[in-house]
Amino acid sequence: MTQPSLSVLYSDHLRTLTARADQALQRGGFDHLVIPSGTTHYQLFDDRDYPFAVNPQFKAWVPLTRMPHSWLVYTPGKRPTVIFYQPFDYWHVVPDAPSGWWVEHCDIHIIRTPEAALPLLPARTERCAILGEAASALGACVPNNPAAVLDFLDYQRAFKTPYELAVMRLAQQLAVRGHRAAEAAFRAGQSEFGIHMAYCSAVGQDANELPYGNIIALNEHGAVLHYTELGRQAPQPLRSFLIDAGASAHGYASDITRTYAADAGSEFQALIDAVDAAQLRMGNAVRAGMDYKQLHVDAHLSLMGILHDFGIITVSPEAALATGVSAAFFPHGLGHLIGLQVHDVAGFAASDRGGRIERPDGHPYLRLTRVLEPGMVVTIEPGVYFIDMLLDEVKKNGHAASVNWDRVAQFAPYGGIRIEDEVVCTDGDPENLTRPVFAAP
């Protein structure tokens, strides 16, 4: 079956965005939506700039991610206007003129200086909802970020359009290409730095283009949840490899994690296999009407069941959860919304009018508390780790007898396990965006 082109999908996507913007502006009492792309920031006491990070609200409308000093203006009933910054500059590469599937749907004005945008922006700035950072202010056009507008737009961003799902699939394909190269580099005995370079080369993106810093962790480093140090020497012996790495496509992110054992016949490989099977079951529970908080709690029980089966804990999964022992082995949340941002916005939103759904007690790092609905894309990333400081807390809290410390000592040199896919909630069965790409030849 032929898939619609990105041009067709983008046209429908834009209709969805304008409808959302119409309602958001009405709620906030504004006439115009104005979104700056962002500005260049410089390092303290230096003339070196930081890598540019585009305003996510801007790239929701147009797939431009490296365009500081540009603007998006939308007035209900009119086509969106893109003010495109293309400076006269012989120090840097100047952006090419706008092109691609999106240009026919927008009115485009090219400017040569940031200040040239001012006469192209709405004159009555008090009638504008201006979404951006304070540094993007230009004359009287100062970001005000009205809550009524942001609450509505952020909440609705959880529901992905077919265009968004299409480009997120592209981000999956790029990341899986990198994951395959990274595993091959691991099997070849490369260092963390070498594996990272193999990943970037395969994806075709450098550290500034990737949606987040690669986590490339060998052996015990897998116990550091956000390990980003990239050792230059491979440890000996080489036991395990945890990789958490994504890719960017037209402003959208992918976020994938895999764990590998150097010895496919080891008990650690068996533990990986058990977590992998549990992760698939968790992904299959991503269904409309399911409370993500419950998925997170169920994940704790499932993982503790595995640890009990492997003789790592001595108490029931329910007891491990109730006493906090489970949090020592699985200290982060099950996952989060993903899209324009890796940790996409409004994960705690009670409604499109604001409010907050709190995390369950004892789970301070869960990033999503909403009830799942069709169109949401979430990560499912259970993990089991052997983290000294957290296991020491188990002892201090009087629960040492709940853990088989000899078994912990056997697994600790491997660091930990995390497996992460992206899953779409639909009206029926969930769609795993990640597994089919790995399964493809």
UniProtKB/Swiss-Prot annotation:
Its cofactor is Mn(2+). PROSITE patterns: PROLINE_PEPTIDASE. Mn(2+) 1 binds at D255, H336, E381, E420. It holds the Pfam family PepQ_N. GO terms for cellular component: cytosol. GO terms for molecular function: aminopeptidase activity; metal ion binding; metalloexopeptidase activity; phosphoric triester hydrolase activity; proline dipeptidase activity. InterPro entries: Creatin/AminoP/Spt16_N (IPR029149), Creatinase/aminopeptidase-like (IPR036005), PepQ_N (IPR048819), Pept_M24 (IPR000994), Peptidase_M24B_aminopep-P_CS (IPR001131), X-Pro_dipept-like (IPR052433), X_Pro_dipept (IPR022846). Mn(2+) 2 binds at D244, D255, E420. Its EC number is 3.4.13.9. Binds 2 manganese ions per subunit. SUPFAM superfamilies: Creatinase/aminopeptidase. GO terms for biological process: proteolysis. Keywords: Dipeptidase, Hydrolase, Manganese, Metal-binding, Metalloprotease, Protease. It catalyses: Xaa-L-Pro dipeptide + H2O = an L-alpha-amino acid + L-proline. PANTHER family: XAA-PRO AMINOPEPTIDASE 3 (PTHR43226), XAA-PRO DIPEPTIDASE (PTHR43226:SF8). HAMAP family: X_Pro_dipeptid. Splits dipeptides with a prolyl residue in the C-terminal position. Belongs to the peptidase M24B family. Bacterial-type prolidase subfamily. This is Xaa-Pro dipeptidase. It comes from Xanthomonas campestris pv. campestris (strain ATCC 33913 / DSM 3586 / NCPPB 528 / LMG 568 / P 25).
